[in-house]
Swiss-Prot record:
Name of the gene encoding the protein in the UniProt record: mtnC
Protein known as: Enolase-phosphatase E1
The keyword Magnesium belongs to this UniProt entry's keyword annotation: yes
GO BP of this protein: L-methionine salvage from methylthioadenosine
GO molecular function annotation: 2,3-diketo-5-methylthiopentyl-1-phosphate enolase activity; 2-hydroxy-3-keto-5-methylthiopentenyl-1-phosphate phosphatase activity; acireductone synthase activity; magnesium ion binding
The keyword Magnesium appears for this protein: yes
Function according to Swiss-Prot or TrEMBL: Bifunctional enzyme that catalyzes the enolization of 2,3-diketo-5-methylthiopentyl-1-phosphate (DK-MTP-1-P) into the intermediate 2-hydroxy-3-keto-5-methylthiopentenyl-1-phosphate (HK-MTPenyl-1-P), which is then dephosphorylated to form the acireductone 1,2-dihydroxy-3-keto-5-methylthiopentene (DHK-MTPene).
EC number(s) on file: 3.1.3.77
Subunit (UniProt): Monomer.
Source organism, top-level taxon: Bacteria
Cofactor(s) the protein needs: Mg(2+)
High-level lineage: Bacteria, Pseudomonadati, Pseudomonadota, Gammaproteobacteria, Pseudomonadales
Gene3D superfamilies: 1.10.720.60, HAD superfamily/HAD-like
Length: 227
């Protein structure tokens, strides 16, 4: 079956893992406490703080305790949805202020533009929040790439290592799984997508082997028509 849609991961795939861990996470850790204190009364922020209390099992936690919980989650690299949402808000401020620029590999930029021109529908699936995804591509070093994408998915669609998440995404974009090419640098994610019926291609940018999948070192080596 021909590929009609391409679903891509971000970290280690379109973008350097180091950008996330060495730039984005430290920025959020530094600015999150002040952001929460200043904006705790804003509805969008307050709802996320309440979600933190619920997930932590501390319904009566005050703002300072919630901040402490968030910093603990950051230290644990916990994929908590309210943490991701709040990080996204902090990053948005940073991007809008010009303090942050999203990293996207040049080979990924070129390929995504080419595939878009060829008529492939492009989607993102990352553990980072949808807002954070949109910021990386919308405020990238290569300019605004957001117009290339037809949609974004995060952990609200399910964990990235579970096949059902990929079935959910296929249904959401109204495209049979066998017509979707999924790109990632993580074998367990590729396995889950494959189990859901998707076609897979791994990115091994630093060498290595992604067992059970076709894999390449650059987006320049991916031809969707060859799958």
């Amino acid at each position: 079956m021909p590929i009609k849609a391409i679903l891509t991961d971000i970290e280690g795939t379109t973008s350097a893992v180091s950008f996330v861990f060495d730039v984005l996470f430290p920025f959020a850790k530094k600015h999150l406490p002040g952001f929460v204190r200043q904006n705790a009364g804003q509805p969008a922020v307050a709802s996320q703080l309440q979600a933190v209390r619920t997930e932590a099992g501390e319904p009566d936690a005050d703002v300072e305790r919630v901040i402490a919980i968030l910093l603990e989650w950051i230290a644990e690299d916990r994929k908590a949805t309210p943490l991701k949402a709040l990080q996204g808000m902090v990053w948005e401020q940073g991007y809008n202020a010009g303090q942050l620029k999203g990293h996207v590999y040049p080979d990924a930029v070129d390929a995504l533009k080419h595939w878009h021109q060829q008529g492939y529908r492009l989607y993102v699936y990352s553990s980072g929040s949808i807002q954070a995804q949109q910021l990386i591509f919308g405020c990238s070093e290569a300019g605004d790439l957001s117009g290339l994408f037809s949609g974004y998915f995060d952990t609200t669609s399910g964990p990235k290592r579970e096949a059902q998440s990929y079935r959910t995404i296929a249904q959401a974009i109204e495209c049979p799984a066998e017509n979707i090419l999924f790109l990632s640098d993580i074998v367990e994610e590729l396995d889950a997508a494959q189990a859901a019926g998707m076609i897979t291609c791994g990115l091994a940018r630093d060498g290595g082997v992604l067992v059970g999948h076709r894999y390449v070192s650059s987006f320049a080596l991916i031809d969707p028509a060859s799958f």
